[in-house]
A protein has these predicted regions:
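Amphipathic alpha-helical interaction surfaces in cytosolic regulatory modules
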Residues: 38, 66-79
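Conserved CoA-thioester-binding segment of acyl-CoA-metabolizing enzymes
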Residues: 1-62, 91
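Short, active-site-adjacent cap segments at secondary-structure transitions
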Residues: 66-70, 109-110, 402-403
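N-terminal glycine-rich phosphate-binding loop for ADP-containing cofactors
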Residues: 2-14, 28, 40, 80-88, ...
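Redox-cofactor binding/interface segments in oxidoreductases and associated redox assembly factors
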Residues: 61-62, 69, 77, 102, ...
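Gly/Ser-rich catalytic serine loop of serine hydrolases
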Residues: 102, 106-112
Length: 669
């Protein structure tokens, strides 16, 4: 090996660097070295150069910067793919007469790992990860991933890796056979491995699939279909891995590519790609140019209930020490046990401090109130905290409905107040609504966004308004579903229709899970504020009868052994409500229920945009997907609305009951 590598002979995004008898093919396409058209062209050219240079005995594929190839360029997927496509790159690697080793640091994902699988060997740094996460985008690997992977590890394990979309860390990857070696220094380690092959090719296409244990594979297939809710991509994942050991190599390869192309062009894949880009767009906030986040190295939380405990667990899991305060000391022991149960071994118990004194929060960089949803209670607490915490500390409210500006007004410096609306369970749910008050300082908002990333949340900024983005839209949806009770449907019929669309749960099942008293308390608050008592009275009657949902064994449904079932008593209350309102019930079909429910969501989402509560349609899609069980494969309510026939959507909006405002469908354009 030369002490000083020779300078590159070709330009970015791919170049060949000579170092002794090893040619390093360097992918330099920041930030993630995506396998774009330019990279594909460059790889084929560099492989040809490697093959034609008699002074080079072997090649090494390596990424510049922080990663190997972390995936394909998704921006290309919405149009016909330009040649050369990824299979041509794979073929060029296999056709190269000299051994080629993939040197992996950072991540080799999707098409990046498929390129590594085409190589004659794979070496990686200990902290590298590999994986085939194409299912995230509603597709399967399209360049041999499902055909080559079962030649390194058994088909059941391969299916698990493909269907979970998980990133396999190098030590596990080595144990499973996904890489050949873990090295301490990537460049010299890869070069040494390449030369150790002594010119021999080790193509996976020349190997048979690993022996198959039928029972293990069928178990993995059942799990994959359940995980993917039998969506088309999940069915094709199973079929592709089955072909890998049942069909000839090239036949399996050709069918995999055909399925990939078909799924890539599907509505579901387009919706999932939309969500991928929406998450990145959500971080771009007007007015934050140059804003520097404040350092947050310790967190205080007031309120040791389920929500406060979940928030504490989320921060502890992210490595931040937490001080949890509740003015009722008897609640703290239960909270500590709850947090420990949430975390298991994810964080050291010593990182959690509990106290019944607000003064314990004085050193914290961020203090979050997670107390009862009552304006006076929250204002009083913020007023007291304002005199305890440091002047440069951030104060946050976990309110899910209330006016953040009114809460912030209780402090001497509203600029340091921001809304951090977590969703229960807070250590699990991906969504974090960040509420920007009228006086919230840019640095405080920037800090909240940075914290959202640190917690692994999908953070979306909302303006101030009752219910912010998500709860406002959800309330409109729930109101319309209750109106359909009067019109002629029953809770189980509405929930069944909604769940058939792909929602995790229908609105009445959700209400039973969260507690009818929660919904009723919010409804009473709004009635007091607006004087509007037009809501369907069934909820009020259920609460008055002590039917609060799952926690009392009865709500919209009856619960026996934890299983929900329709309750004739609820049907009787619905009939009573119809009689009181003078409504003659009509049969509502599943499609009618679905159309009205979706139209209610779309209409309120359009109004949220119109009122400036959400910055962009894609932010609303993220909120409904990550916090409210909206079907991910539909891409969110406004993405879905854009794909619908405009005239039919207009008719569905017109059919909504008791609508006070109509959203403008032109906003979809």
């Amino acid at each position: 090996m030369n002490a000083t590598p020779q300078p590159p002979t070709s330009a970015a995004p791919v170049r060949l660097e000579r170092d002794g008898s090893v040619g390093f093919i360097v992918i330099d396409n920041p930030p993630i070295n995506a396998g774009s058209l330019g990279v594909r062209q460059g790889l084929i050219a560099a492989l040809g150069e490697l093959a034609g240079d008699a002074s080079l005995a072997a090649g090494v594929l390596i990424g510049a910067g922080t990663t190997f190839i972390a995936g394909s360029d998704l921006r290309e997927f919405s149009a016909p793919l330009a040649d050369p496509q990824m299979p041509a790159v794979i073929a060029a690697i296999e056709a190269c007469p000299k051994p080629v080793v993939a040197a992996i640091h950072g991540a080799a994902l999707g098409g990046g790992y498929e390129i590594a699988l085409a190589c004659d060997a794979r070496v990686a740094l200990a902290d590298a990860v590999v994986g085939l996460p194409e299912g995230t985008f509603g597709i399967i690997p399209g360049a041999g991933g499902t055909v080559r992977l079962p030649r390194l590890t058994d088909a059941a394990t391969a299916l698990d890796i493909v269907s979970t979309c998980r990133r396999v860390k190098a030590p596990e990857a080595k144990a499973l056979g996904l890489i050949d070696a873990a090295v301490d220094e990537l460049r010299p380690g890869a070069a040494a491995f390449a030369l150790s092959l002594k010119g021999a090719k080790r193509r996976l296409r020349d190997l048979p699939a690993k022996p198959v244990e039928a029972e293990a594979f069928e178990k993995a297939a059942t799990a994959a279909l359940k995980r993917g809710r039998s969506r088309p991509y999940a069915q094709e994942q199973v079929a592709a891995l089955r072909r890998a050991f049942e069909a000839p190599f090239d036949a399996a390869l050709a069918e995999e590519r055909a399925v990939f192309q078909r799924l890539r062009q599907s509505d579901e894949s387009a919706a999932l790609r939309h969500l991928f880009f929406a998450e990145r767009e959500a971080a771009r906030i007007d007015g934050l140019e140059g804003a520097k986040p404040l350092p947050v190295k310790s967190v205080g939380i007031v309120g040791a209930g389920t929500m406060g405990s979940g928030i504490a667990a989320a921060f502890l899991a992210a490595g931040l020490p937490v001080t949890l305060v509740d003015l009722k000391p008897e609640l703290l022991d239960a909270a500590r046990q709850r947090v420990a149960g949430f975390l298991a071994k994810a964080a050291k118990p010593a990182a959690l401090t509990t106290s019944s004194e607000l003064g314990a929060l004085a050193p914290c960089d961020l203090v979050i109130e997670a107390v009862f949803e009552d304006m006076a209670v929250k204002q009083d607490l913020l007023r007291r905290l304002d005199g305890i915490v440091r002047p440069d500390a951030i104060l946050a409210s976990n309110t899910s409905y209330l006016d953040l500006d009114a809460i912030a007004a209780a402090t001497a410096e509203p600029a340091r107040v921001v809304g951090l609306h977590f969703f229960a369970p807070a250590h699990v749910m991906k969504l974090l609504e960040i509420v920007r008050g009228a006086k919230t300082a840019p640095a405080v908002l920037a800090s909240a966004l940075k914290l959202g990333r640190a917690l692994g949340k999908v953070a979306v900024v909302s303006g101030v308004g009752d219910g912010f983005i998500g709860n406002r839209i959800y309330n409109a949806y729930r109101t319309q579903c209750e109106a359909m009770l009067l019109a002629g449907a029953l809770p189980e019929e509405i929930d069944g229709a909604i769940e058939a669309l792909g929602f995790a749960m229908g609105p009445f099942a959700v209400s039973d899970l969260s507690g009818l008293d929660i919904a009723w308390a919010n409804r009473k608050r709004k009635q007091a504020e607006t004087g509007d008592h037009s809501d369907v009275p069934v909820l009020e009657w259920l609460v008055a009868g002590g039917r609060l949902g799952r926690k009392t064994g009865a709500g919209w449904y009856a619960y026996e052994d934890g299983r929900r079932s329709p309750d004739p008593a609820v049907a009787g209350l619905v009939v009573k409500a119809r009689a009181e309102r003078g409504v003659t019930a009509a049969s509502l079909g599943r499609e009618t229920i679905q159309n009205r429910a979706m139209a209610a969501i779309v209409n309120e989402a359009l109004l949220v945009l119109e009122d400036g509560i959400a910055a962009r349609p894609s932010d609303i899609d993220l909120v409904l997907i990550n916090g409210y069980g909206f079907p991910r494969h539909l891409g969110g309510p406004l993405w879905w609305a854009k794909t619908q026939d405009r005239q039919r959507l207009e008719q569905a909006l017109q059919a909504l009951q008791g609508l006070k405002r109509r959203g403008d469908l032109a906003r979809l354009d």
